[in-house]
A protein has these predicted regions:
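Internal glycine-rich alpha/beta core junctions
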Residues: 1-76
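Catalytic-core signal marking the mid-to-C-terminal active-site face
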Residues: 42-204
Length: 204
């Protein structure tokens, strides 16, 4: 039973790593991360210029193989016909196979992370264009001064819309709030506003 429990724990651990590999793959696709080029790597069979996130793809694949085996182990090992059959010994011989897949995946992840370079320009450009993130700050001030339906008003302004600086500042100018609060809101930018993120991160 303890082996089955251990296998289930490894499945959960591997699933977290799969999520990490997929997220990192996505950030590479978005251009938030660049990868250092290795001269001996083949980019693509048809696109020689391409730098594939191959290490993260390899890690994801190997972790998936490990999880398939571990899930079977966890379901099989507690079950025995009248507590007498020997199918468990066949299964136990393959515990090392699952461990091997995990080891290869970890090596791939470490190799992939070692190649990453942060593309600060791309990240800053996306943040600078995301004026809708300031809806939180505007809504908080609206609530403070008793303006009705602040959430609904900001939702109508921002949801599914391309929010620009001019659109948001026109909305702020229309609010019946003290001039000092208006001025404070108008000076906010997506790059400078972090809300309570700093405090919440430190409270962890």
């Amino acid at each position: 039973d303890w082996t089955a429990e251990y296998c289930h724990a490894l499945v959960r651990y591997n699933t977290i790593l799969i999520d990490f590999a997929r997220d990192t793959w996505g950030y590479i696709s978005l251009g938030y991360f660049r990868q250092k080029v290795a001269k001996d790597e083949v980019g693509s069979s048809t696109m020689p210029h391409k730098v594939n996130p191959i290490d993260f793809e390899n890690a994801e694949g190997n972790l998936g193989m490990a999880n398939a085996l571990l899930q079977h182990f966890a379901e099989k090992l507690p079950v025995s016909r009248w507590q007498r059959d020997l199918t468990d010994s066949t299964v136990q011989r393959n515990l090392g196979v699952a461990a091997g897949y995990i080891l290869i995946a970890l090596q791939s992840l470490l190799k992939g992370v070692g190649k990453l370079q942060v593309n600060e320009e791309a990240i800053q450009a996306d943040v600078a264009a995301a004026w809708e993130v300031l809806a939180e700050a505007v809504q908080t001030v609206m609530r403070r001064y008793g303006i009705p339906e602040p959430y609904e008003k900001l939702k109508a302004l921002t949801r599914g819309q391309a929010v620009t600086r001019d659109i948001l500042q026109t909305f702020i100018d229309s609010l019946e709030i003290p001039a000092s609060e208006k001025k404070r809101l108008l000076t906010l930018t997506p790059e400078t506003y972090i809300g309570l993120a700093d405090k919440q991160a430190r409270d962890l």
